[in-house]
């Protein structure tokens, strides 16, 4: 069950890029945090940004995490143009807080702004990523068959609306 707590991951561009390995690394960190709370099923909702959310790097990391930690992971993609997710709301709150600041000069100031952006409720949980927090998921991505799905049909990653990984069958794709 969710706790309505927003989680933010930050790093500057001298530390890492903003590609699928970086996003997968943040998601893996989030999954590990949830395991400490006894969570066995995690459901992610995200937009259709293929470069960050809907790609074989993220999916390979989910398969790895599902098998390694014995958990179920479900990732649902929102319909383009029909929904607004919690991430959009969080970004709006952070942007609003930024407008109230005269200037921001350092990454530390950004982190403090993000932590304090939410006026009511729990503040956002902010993790400042370091180089050691990022992984390269290329090797595990290469071990998967991305050409066909479990039933042998052509796998169109851009058409995926939902994908589920079970610890007993980490390669299942819906």
Regions found by a protein language model. Name each.
Residues 1-174:
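Extended mixed-charge, aromatic/glycine-enriched low-complexity segments
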């Amino acid at each position: 069950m969710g706790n309505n707590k927003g989680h933010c991951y930050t790093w500057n561009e001298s530390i890492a890029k903003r590609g699928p390995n970086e996003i997968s690394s943040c998601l893996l960190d989030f999954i590990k945090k949830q395991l400490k709370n006894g969570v066995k099923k995690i459901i992610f909702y995200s937009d259709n940004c293929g470069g960050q959310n809907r790609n074989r790097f993220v999916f390979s990391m989910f398969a790895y995490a599902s098998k390694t930690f014995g958990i179920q992971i479900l990732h649902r993609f929102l319909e383009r143009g029909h929904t607004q997710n919690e991430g959009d709301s969080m970004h709006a709150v952070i942007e609003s807080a930024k407008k109230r600041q005269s200037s921001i000069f350092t990454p530390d100031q950004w982190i403090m702004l993000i932590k304090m952006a939410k006026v009511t409720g729990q503040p956002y949980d902010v993790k400042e990523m370091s180089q050691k927090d990022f992984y390269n998921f290329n090797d595990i991505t290469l071990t998967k068959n991305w050409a066909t799905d479990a039933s042998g049909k052509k796998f169109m990653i851009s058409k995926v609306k939902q994908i589920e990984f079970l610890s007993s069958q980490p390669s299942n794709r819906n």
